[in-house]
């Protein structure tokens, strides 16, 4: 694996000079191998190691290189034809392979090659970008978008129209991460490498980026870039210091554990926030 990484790192340093016409065989094969490993889930752009999320920047570099080494080509889709550098993940799937991999894909859902989809996942008409990782038992609902390199945990529900931000550049930026057993309400947006920790519930229409204040009403603490585990979050506002105006924030209205989540429905958690 180190040799593969070395090839990618070296090629990335001279990426400005690489074209589909002049790319060398070693680089092309290395990039294609990484995309294949991302596609199968054998590699992932970010993973939790000793309780901390670690981003493998060289894998992002491989994804960026894939755009340098490939020409656009005609791609057949369910209702139309497309013209792009990245093939669709399911272009060569037959019924046997779908049965073997064990997930459902509802037309016209689109997944780019280099994204991993785990067993028992349901993809409603949605979009999953290259480098993303979608773990077991997750529902990606209608018109939801999973951005490039985003990491989606087990048993997550991304409701209709949810946007999970992608990140390829700048390289130092970390991917957006939704940990296991989270619920993201309709039309909410989580972007810019924000981490939503395990078991959290995000209400409908909540927007969270790195600069969004995440206010815990029980403690008065303000978080940035991270929703603590087990949080129930709704949209809100915080007043300015002079009291003349207020600005948008996300509000943690309560904390729940797995036992409570198991007994109480998501809608009930969001209704009883007083």
Curated annotation (Swiss-Prot):
Gene Ontology, cellular component aspect: cytoplasm
Catalytic activity: (S)-2,3,4,5-tetrahydrodipicolinate + succinyl-CoA + H2O = (S)-2-succinylamino-6-oxoheptanedioate + CoA
CDD domains recorded: LbH_THP_succinylT
GO biological process per UniProt: diaminopimelate biosynthetic process; lysine biosynthetic process via diaminopimelate
Molecular function via GO: 2,3,4,5-tetrahydropyridine-2,6-dicarboxylate N-succinyltransferase activity; nucleotidyltransferase activity
Pathway the protein acts in: Amino-acid biosynthesis; L-lysine biosynthesis via DAP pathway; LL-2,6-diaminopimelate from (S)-tetrahydrodipicolinate (succinylase route): step 1/3
UniProt record similarity statement: Belongs to the transferase hexapeptide repeat family.
Annotated protein name in UniProt: 2,3,4,5-tetrahydropyridine-2,6-dicarboxylate N-succinyltransferase
Species whose genome carries this gene: Citrobacter koseri (strain ATCC BAA-895 / CDC 4225-83 / SGSC4696)
UniProt gene name: dapD
